Amino acid sequence: MRRLCTFGMMLALTTGCSPPAPQAPQATSEPVSKLGIRPQGDTEIQPDLSQVPPEVQKVFAYIDEHIDEHVENLQKWIRQPSISNSGEGIPESAEMVKGFFDELGCQQTQIFDVGVTEYGAPGNPVVYAKCDEGAEKTLMIYWMYDTMPVTQPDAWMAPPFEGRLVEQAPYKKVLIGRGATNSKGPQMSQLNAFRAIKAVHGRLPVNLIFVAEGDEERMDIGLRKFVKDHPELLEGADGMLRFGSQSPSGSGGYGGGSEGCVYVELTTSGTAWGRGPTVSDIHGSNKRSVDSPAWRHIKMLASLVSDDGNTPLIDGFLEGIQPLTEWQEADLKNAAARTDLKVAAENVGVARYISDDPYTMLKMQRYGTSFNLDGIWGGNMYAGGAGAILPNKVTSKHNFRYVPNMTGPDIVKKLRAQLDKNGYKDVEVKMIGDVPWAKMNSDNDAGRALKRAYEVMNIPHGELRADWGIGGGGGAAGGYWPAYLFGNGEVGEKVSSYAGIPIAAGGGGYGGRAHAANEFYVIEGAGRVYGMAGAEKVVAAMAYAFAGRIPPAPSPTN
């Protein structure tokens, strides 16, 4: 039997193992809140209770009975801002997350100050917890508690930090808020599921290790340093569950891998150029006789992309890209057959995709590369009004999405060379951070447990694959995540001595408009998409399946 060795709050003073968590009394309390949430919503699929033992059926029933309270838990989290790029609410959020783990009964909970990172900026705290339940197997849970800022508050239908429930067809209730789907909604569904299990049975079927970062929207710079400095804290886990959700059509995926992403800032200044304003912005009337660093910056950016902005014009940019496997091509075709581009575009919040062909769109989304303009600033930044300014400096932010076998540092090197070739040697290039790609074998214990949960919940899903790669597979598509720090497969860069573990990324439920106005998480499901109660049941079923306490799926009959 494998037991999870627990540690005291001061790691350097700890020896030996703490006893497992005492068994809590079984819950008999009635629901305490009255939001009127319908656990099943209008979802057409239901769990097959014949496939799970009574102990899991009791957890499912508890989730249904307490779903109002569980939604309120998410609302409380949404109301706490946690914006990593500005720092707003980060210390309070770290304490809040630590409180979640304390309430769950984890014997060790600690907030780590990671200090200054290799990129020169201080990292945000990492919240770490170990929960010894006396179980044979240990599941690691990755979280991010930070969110993007709110850049267009007037575009929101409800205040972004209120957590308001609204109707959004086809769903009778969704929760609107910053971080609703990315990623407080799916993560609170995990926590609610674990709380439900402990409320019903007093003990979880698996031990848990939580790693919650506050820098996901800052290229994971703090987590990267944490893993480098404390690889021993990750030891002992048998697998990882990363939060996830269904696709808009209701499919479940496995994920676990990740694309690569490198983030840079480009700056054009009068000082470096030797022309235009140098010390500060000057009066705009001087443009009649003075060069403009701002116009130079615009011309520079235009030289790096095609006229439509969709193809990087950087020599050697695509060198090293691996072709898709036969299975990946087939998986894309299968997914394309189930994809409604109009619905997908509405959920993301775009007028249309670059391509009107579902296969091409999915291929771009899952395995494509890009050079994005995230933002640009300099000079008169006030909306409306007037004011003549000739800026002395303009800076723009950019992310490059890349795939195996490209690397972030090589992309930045090629960008620098292209700028020099185009006549922009004066333009400054600053790397903000890099998240290398990671491949994943989804046919592992965590993946098989997630698949078993999908079977129990009647969620359509694909097959587990040893050659899964960086993404794909039915679930909702997303961006990068720091899989390279945790996975045991091929990665773009290895940064610590930690050997890594099998990973499964997926879940029930759905949300959309991450990073955008009116970000949402589905509370009452519809069609083949579960709401929050269904998402929690997937987590509970996965935990019991990982522990070996849900029987194998029944054999199909002819």
What is each of the regions a protein language model found here?
Residues R2-G8:
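Sec-dependent signal peptide recognition
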Residues T14-G16:
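C-terminal motif of bacterial Sec signal peptides marking the signal peptidase cleavage site
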Residues N73, I83-K137, E162, A169:
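A non-catalytic alpha/beta surface segment that caps or lines the substrate-entry region
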Residues E136-A212:
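Active-site metal-coordination/substrate-binding segment of hydrolases
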Residues S249, L313-K393, R401-K414, N422, ...:
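An extended, acidic, His-containing surface patch that forms the Zn2+-binding/catalytic region
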Residues G179-F194, K198-D356, L362-T369, F520-M532, ...:
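Fold-level recognition of mixed alpha/beta catalytic cores in primary-metabolism enzymes, strongest
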Residues P22-G89:
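N-terminal hydrophobic or amphipathic helices/low-complexity stretches enriched
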Residues S18-P20:
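Bacterial signal peptide processing site
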